[in-house]
C-alpha cells in the first residue's frame, strides 16, 4: 500500500513538473515571436534558455524547434541537430499545417546540409518545395 501511494505521488509530481515546463516554454515561444522582427538576438537568447527539451510534449518541442530554427536562419547561425529537426518534422508531418510542414522541412534540409548529408538534404528540400507549392 505504501509503495502504491509513493508511486502515485511520484507520478503526480512528474506530471505537474512536465505540464509546468510546457507552459513555461509556450510563454517563451510567445515572447520570442514578439521579439523576432525587432530584436532577433533577444529572441534567440530566450529560445536558448530552454534547458530540459526531453520533458516537453511533442507539440511544444516541435514548436520550439520551428521557432529556434527560424531565428537561427535569420541570424545566420548553425542549424539545430538533425535529430531535433527530424523529430519536429515527423510531428508536423502527422499533426501540423502544410505551411509548418514546408518550413520545418526547409530547416531539416539546412540541418542535413550542415552535417554533410547532402543527399538527405536534397531529398527533404524537394519534399519541402512540394509542400510549399501545395500550401499556396
Report residues per predicted region.
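A "functional boundary" signal
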Residues: 5-9, 16-136
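N-terminal secretory signal peptides that target proteins for export/translocation
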Residues: 1-3
Amino acid at each position: 500500500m505504501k509503495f502504491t501511494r509513493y508511486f502515485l505521488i511520484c507520478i503526480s509530481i512528474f506530471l505537474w513538473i512536465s505540464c509546468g515546463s510546457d507552459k513555461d516554454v509556450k510563454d517563451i515561444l510567445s515572447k520570442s515571436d514578439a521579439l523576432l522582427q525587432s530584436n532577433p538576438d533577444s529572441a534567440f537568447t530566450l529560445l536558448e534558455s530552454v534547458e530540459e527539451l526531453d520533458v516537453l510534449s511533442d507539440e511544444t518541442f516541435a514548436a520550439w524547434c520551428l521557432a529556434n530554427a527560424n531565428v537561427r536562419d535569420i541570424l545566420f547561425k548553425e542549424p539545430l541537430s538533425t535529430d531535433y529537426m527530424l523529430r519536429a518534422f515527423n510531428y508536423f508531418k502527422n499533426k501540423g499545417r502544410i505551411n509548418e510542414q514546408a518550413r520545418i522541412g526547409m530547416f531539416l534540409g539546412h540541418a542535413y546540409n550542415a552535417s554533410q548529408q547532402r543527399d538527405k538534404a536534397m531529398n527533404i528540400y524537394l519534399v519541402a518545395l512540394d509542400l510549399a507549392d501545395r500550401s499556396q
